[in-house]
């Protein structure tokens, strides 16, 4: 019967998330040694025993692969899920990659957030920023999309504040910025294609259950 099964395909966000996810899979008995080969040119990796396929993708693309069913399951940061806003089910908080999405700026900008002034907000996450200011705070803002070094925004007076991921806050401190408001907590999540969720309900439920148990026993 095993050979009749189709492969369950996973899209993993490249980098630390993928590494952590694969470690987690190993703990529940799912190995994929090919993926550990640093020199490999392969794009898709297979575990024949459990009929699983894995591929690595850029974080922001993971929800796209999952929405279109090119991957049944994805592992990606909550920031990406919120920003990309794809039609996927979020089934599990994996608990690693913990950080926060925050509004940051110089201390003086705190006042601008209180009085609903029209301010400029720089962010790699324009959708998250828009959702937060327009729908949660009901504050009209101009959102400026940047692709990196967002901390520069307030320093060169491109923006009053930024919306960005904060882990330790040391980069902010070095640049005379601070967390002014917290938008939401973030961590790695497992997402599933809605059709796969129905068609492969048992396999996916078993997998999610096994991972959930494993996460419970971790320190």
Task: Name each model feature, range by range.
Residues 2-219:
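Domain-level signature for soluble enzymes in the chorismate/prephenate branch of the shikimate pathway
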